UniProtKB/Swiss-Prot annotation:
It catalyses: 2 glutathione + H2O2 = glutathione disulfide + 2 H2O. This is Probable glutathione peroxidase 8. Its EC number is 1.11.1.9. It comes from Homo sapiens. CDD domains: GSH_Peroxidase.
Length: 209
């Protein structure tokens, strides 16, 4: 019996090498494209474009506050600054809100572990003890990789990261951060900037009529 003749593989040779190179290029291109879709999300340029959770854990779109002035604050119940700040925030919200202005409070336990309560209890505590009527959202993290995206937007825009409770970020009707204040700064310092922005909102609404 004669041995079988050895035949050369058809895929060997220059054409096969070219095909392999082209296939590698295509695979690399597809892989890079998929990675871009996964990691390169469109840049959000407005605070009001985010969604957050309310104190009961329900999703809330911040779009509802677009067109108003907002003072966004990281709050805490067991801080030496709690009384003064909650009362001051209540005063501002009563004076300028709710049609043209709102305080938006985000509880956080990362600064001195001053907010150990669950979100619902934080809201109840603030309403009962200080009579606040402004929105109090779900407890969040601000620092680290688990930082709430909406609040991180404020931090990144202002280049100012909170170092304690009750940092305040003033957001204009378009969702841009225009100013920030540290917790020890009195309400009297904050009021003129809020008043100026609210005045602009009122004038614009009259012009649009």
């Amino acid at each position: 019996m004669e041995p079988l003749a050895a035949y050369p593989l058809k895929c060997s040779g220059p054409r096969a090498k070219v095909f392999a190179v082209l296939l590698s290029i295509v695979l690399c291109t597809v892989t890079l494209f998929l990675l871009q879709l996964k990691f390169l999300k469109p840049k959000i340029n407005s605070f009001y474009a985010f969604e957050v959770k309310d104190a009961k854990g329900r999703t809330v779109s911040l779009e509802k506050y677009k067109g108003k002035v907002s003072l966004v604050v990281n709050v805490a119940s067991d801080c030496q600054l709690t009384d003064r700040n909650y009362l001051g925030l209540k005063e501002l919200h009563k004076e300028f809100g709710p049609s043209h202005f709102s305080v938006l409070a985000f509880p956080c336990n990362q600064f001195g572990e001053s907010e150990p309560r669950p979100s619902k209890e934080v809201e109840s505590f603030a309403r009962k003890n200080y009579g606040v009527t402004f929105p109090i959202f779900h407890k969040i993290k601000i620092l680290g990789s688990e930082g709430e995206p909406a609040f991180r937007f404020l931090v990144d825009s202002s280049k100012k990261e909170p170092r304690w409770n009750f940092w305040k970020y003033l957001v204009n009707p378009e969702g841009q951060v225009v100013k920030f204040w540290k917790p020890e700064e009195p309400i009297e310092v904050i009021r003129p900037d809020i008043a100026a922005l609210v005045r602009q909102v009122i004038i614009k609404k009259k012009e649009d009529l």
